[in-house]
Amino acid sequence: MKRTEEIQAESLPSSHPGNARRWAVPEAVKLYLIVSAGSVIGSVLRALASIGTLAWLGPGFPWGTLLVNVIGSFVIGFYATLTGPGGRVFAGTRQRQFVMTGICGGFTTFSMFSYETFRFVQTGSWPMAGLNVGVSITTWLVAVWLGHMVASRLNRLGGV
């Protein structure tokens, strides 16, 4: 037999606060959905950047992958520093995960970098493979450092 409270809750509209407990979404699920949404945005931006770079610079070198990974490295260095402890901008866990894990994770692509390097090796283009690895790793590290430095500078400015 149902309790009086259960019968009353069933008769309430779904938007009624009394039904909130039945429709509560666990925090972990909310975080996964937020990261997923960021990943969709990042992936679409990556596709657009790669297509645009291919049309602009041609297929001789994986410029699109290099570009998205440099931009993503800068953004994650910038955002992590700007929103980190002592940062100028407060961002909660969800916001940080949305940008850093979702958007940056969907935008950057280590797997494509690995594949493109492998293809150079497979076709005997060892100099291009070495160039790809050297230029990529160097520019990614410089970009994350620059992002960190710009955000550190902003964090020291007064105001906001």
Where are these regions (language model features)?
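Membrane-interface helix-loop junctions in multi-pass transporters/channels
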Residues: 1-160
